[in-house]
Amino acid sequence: MTVLERLDRVGKKLLATGNGRCNLTNRNAAPEHYHSADTARLADILERTPPDAVLDFFGEMGLLCDTQADGRVYPYCYQASMVLDVLRAALERAGVDVACSCGVAEVEKGPGGFSVRTRDGRAFSAARVVLAAGGQAGPQFGTDGSAFALARMLGHSVAEPYPCLVPLRCAGFPVGLKGVRANCALSLYLDGRCAGTERGEVQFAEYGLSGIPAMQLSCLLGPGVKKAGTSVDFFPEMAFPVLRGMLEQRCASGMFASLETLLLGLVAKKLGHAILKSCGLQPLSRAPGSLSRREVNALASALKNWRFAVEGTLPWTQAQVTGGGVPLAEVKT
């Protein structure tokens, strides 16, 4: 058995997984947690290789693991470098040859097996070939998308790749929100229809939205999407009439001297000011009691449905995974 590694050392990208901690698997792995049109094939794969099988695989190599409350599994030492060391040691014990700086240029299937030619002219032959070259996400770690050309050589079709688990670029995004975080519900609209909603901590940036909810929804932004937008609900567990009533009470209470403090205790200060401005509620020195019912209604609407047009995502360097590629239906299980 021989491993052909295009880079000068194996496992370079592995060191970056899980923010350097290496998320090995998830105890809650299930088809509904994946983005795929072929859920039947996905279910079959997960049934054949459940999380316990993954943990047994690493356990047999001597790696002790730790499972978090949300089901994520990491090496007990929480160091990706340890996972790489364990894998390299297993290769050595099994007598596997590893050829680094050995990028593959061509692969061809013939009557007697496969022939492989590298970029520097070396030739290899094998009864079986495993193409495990990754996609295009994180090119700074060595991935360049060249594996898709090899897949085509073997007769596979390749759907147009696109960045996934990546922050969203939003048009007309308010300035000054960089670094602000909020627990909320984030929805993605594609061509006017809600394509998905994720709840959790959203991070506001100078370009748009980040955080787990935004990155999860980015997987729905495939090629061909003509119009996309987001909706931020800062109070997903509170019905609109209840929120509006609370705002009306705050305006009438006299507790808040100006709009500058009206949303104090509800959302972050910078966020509150940006929302008020988006509703045209200026200046901030204005007395809350002067707001009309229509203006209070507009403010409540913004807190429940703050909308932004999505221009796209950040580039491949910020993406964690690749969408598209070889269809799951063409992968034998």
Model-derived features with residue positions:
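A conserved short coil-to-beta-strand element within the FAD-binding core of flavoproteins
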Residues: 100-113
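A glycine-rich dinucleotide-binding beta-alpha-beta segment and adjacent secondary-structure elements
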Residues: 100, 273-333
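Short hydrophobic core segments
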Residues: 2-4, 104, 123-143, 151-152, ...
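Glycine-centered tight beta-turn/hairpin loop motif at sheet-sheet or coil-to-beta transitions
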Residues: 119-121, 193
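An anion/pyrophosphate-binding glycine-rich loop and adjacent beta-alpha core
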Residues: 8-10, 15-16, 24-31, 64, ...
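General beta-strand structural signal in soluble alpha/beta enzymes
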Residues: 3-5, 67, 98-100, 131, ...
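Conserved N-terminal/central alpha/beta ligand/cofactor-binding core
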Residues: 6-97, 102
